[in-house]
């Protein structure tokens, strides 16, 4: 079985996501009990992309989330370092540049884009898997235009610690078990539950975003804090 460890070696993480690409979107819906769609809708609303804007959807996976940003006329670059994920998404859309979405292979720590390229940048359920989060946040700032915005949708922590520990225990046991019913690589989902447990809480991530140079950092909880939506701006 292919899985990554919490040191998040980029090659291991990419190989792990390659191995689950074919059924990734289905498993997301099952494991989130259908809440994944609501979380993505909240992310689209927070990005608030409109006609003429260019959006970077980093860690886009199969590009399911990317298509949502095009509904008001924005153009989207779907960037991911898992070739397996990008391949599955391109096959579903009928090409690497279709329906307002252009697929680009890239590393969050070395984004293949010029300074101040994007009006908005966003990453959903992917920042947690990056080897160097601080550097990735700085790279996202670099490629964002002055006045542009950042939206991060990521698993987080319930504000009541005993409940958060119970949820973490349930995910540690439940995610791999459910994944076994649908995936050839359930070990990958053991890594995902471990990475969620090790992730900073809402305030901790907000501090990281501010330290990277972003301004007006704010967040709100989705599903009681199971997921948090952070938003920030590049002011200079």
From Swiss-Prot:
Catalytic activity: a 2-demethylmenaquinol + S-adenosyl-L-methionine = a menaquinol + S-adenosyl-L-homocysteine + H(+)
Bilayer-spanning residue ranges: none
Classification via InterPro entries: SAM-dependent_MTases_sf, UbiE/COQ5_MeTrFase, UbiE/COQ5_MeTrFase_CS
Gene: menG
Protein name in the entry: Demethylmenaquinone methyltransferase
Pathway: Quinol/quinone metabolism; menaquinone biosynthesis; menaquinol from 1,4-dihydroxy-2-naphthoate: step 2/2
NCBIfam families to which the protein is assigned, alphabetical: MenG_MenH_UbiE, PRK00216.1-2
One Pfam assignment: Ubie_methyltran
């Amino acid at each position: 079985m292919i899985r990554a460890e919490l040191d998040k070696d980029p090659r291991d993480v990419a190989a792990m996501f390659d191995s689950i690409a074919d059924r990734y979107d289905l498993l997301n819906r099952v494991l989130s009990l259908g809440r994944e769609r609501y979380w993505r809708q909240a992310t689209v609303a927070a990005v608030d992309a409109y006609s003429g804007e260019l959006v970077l959807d980093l860690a886009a996976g199969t590009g399911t989330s990317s298509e949502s940003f095009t509904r008001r006329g924005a153009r989207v670059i779907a960037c991911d370092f898992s070739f397996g994920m990008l391949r599955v998404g391109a096959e579903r859309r009928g090409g690497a540049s279709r329906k307002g979405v252009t697929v680009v292979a890239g590393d969050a720590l070395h984004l293949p884009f010029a300074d101040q390229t994007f009006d908005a940048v966003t990453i959903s359920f992917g920042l947690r898997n990056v080897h160097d989060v601080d550097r990735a946040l700085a790279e996202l700032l670099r490629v964002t235009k002055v006045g542009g915005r950042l939206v991060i949708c990521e698993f987080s922590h319930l504000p009541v610690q005993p409940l958060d520990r119970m949820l973490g225990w349930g995910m540690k046991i439940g995610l791999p078990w459910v994944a076994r019913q649908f995936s050839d690589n359930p070990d990958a989902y053991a890594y995902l539950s471990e990475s969620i447990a090790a992730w900073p809480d809402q305030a901790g991530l907000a501090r990281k975003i501010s330290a990277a140079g972003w301004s007006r950092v704010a967040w709100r909880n989705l599903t009681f804090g199971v997921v948090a939506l952070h938003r920030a701006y590049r002011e200079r």
